[in-house]
Amino acid sequence: MENAKMNSLIAQYPLVEDLVALKETTWFNPGTTSLAEGLPYVGLTEQDVQDAHARLSRFAPYLAKAFPETAAAGGIIESELVAIPAMQKRLEKEYQQPISGQLLLKKDSHLPISGSIKARGGIYEVLAHAEKLALEAGLLTLEDDYSKLLSPEFKQFFSQYSIAVGSTGNLGLSIGIMSARIGFKVTVHMSADARAWKKAKLRSHGVTVVEYEQDYGVAVEEGRKAAQSDPNCFFIDDENSRTLFLGYSVAGQRLKAQFAQQGRIVDADNPLFVYLPCGVGGGPGGVAFGLKLAFGDHVHCFFAEPTHSPCMLLGVHTGLHDQISVQDIGIDNLTAADGLAVGRASGFVGRAMERLLDGFYTLSDQTMYDMLGWLAQEEGIRLEPSALAGMAGPQRVCASVSYQQLHGFSAEQLRNATHLVWATGGGMVPEEEMNQYLAKGR
């Protein structure tokens, strides 16, 4: 972006200057509305989410057999919700900032099959595509026991079709493993940030991995191009897919059930704050949509991004969405948080969700490494760097009197609050890689 344009952007949006300087930045969204007002802009409804629930239930018998690690849960791919009181104390001590309310962790980092939040959307979209093909071919009815998809006849049928996706790692992992298990031929286009172990794991499942020297945007574009030339190839579009988004949104009702089980209340007097790491936006966008449908105006969602990849904060704050990239303002999009190394946000998610999100913030790689170490020490939970992005949120919210006043939170409401950090990945990180992460924390 030439200087004159850049200066006028900063004059209009002074916060951009902090982003350019790679400062850890928090922006509380002044444009947040009620669910009733914001919902029409999403273009999806509660019914769409119910359909996704139903589809995952139909596939449960199949998943229970195809992936024995899901059998105990009856073929439902869900993660634990745990309190992390020792980490809460550690954060308060390190930042000299009390966190009122209770701190919880949602362990999508340990989801079965692929060990990340992408096991929600990625697996769901592969299943939805497989179902559509099998129904159209007359091989399946909605009433069938879907475990029949494991038969050689189905394997043979699906092998005529292929799937392609562009990914920084975790989405590729979930789509690759699921597609290969069903019988699709699958190609994952991996950006330069992708970890070597993720590529190796995919190849061990018989997935074709194409590597790029460039970032996420290039990998997605190349994947899209490769798929266009083959009518039997289905491209899973992380930037624009409504299906992926709905796969994530199912988490809202599931979390509501977990809260009920644990006797946790969410209402006007007991607000829920949720902190979601954000890459291109599909995962956190879908989850936030599901949370809003489940908890209404009593849930407050925040997106967290690396200082080197603040694409969603930049897009929503300036209103330019996918018309601007972090590279346009001179930011390099290089971060240890490989899952969040995205320079241009999803225009679909930004426009759909901007009224339903309370805020956005950035944090440095070093902050993520530090918190990764603290969580391992205090709670014995090991995550990958990007999964810690949400952990900086509670202290930002508790420190901002202006945000609390904007939403009219009383001291008592904040004392009764639940702060939920969404841990997005790390359950499958190899030991020696994890030790390298731990060594970088202070």
From Swiss-Prot:
The N6-(pyridoxal phosphate)lysine modification is found at 118
Please name the HAMAP family in this protein's record.
Answer: D_Ser_dehydrat
Record keyword Lyase present: yes
Share what the entry says about its subunit structure, partners included.
Monomer.
Ordered alphabetically, the record's keywords are: Lyase, Pyridoxal phosphate
Q: What is this protein called?
A: D-serine dehydratase
- Keyword Lyase assigned to the entry: answer is yes
Looking at the record's lineage, which domain of life comes first? Bacteria
User: Which reaction is this enzyme known to catalyze?
Assistant: D-serine = pyruvate + NH4(+)
Uppermost EC category: lyase
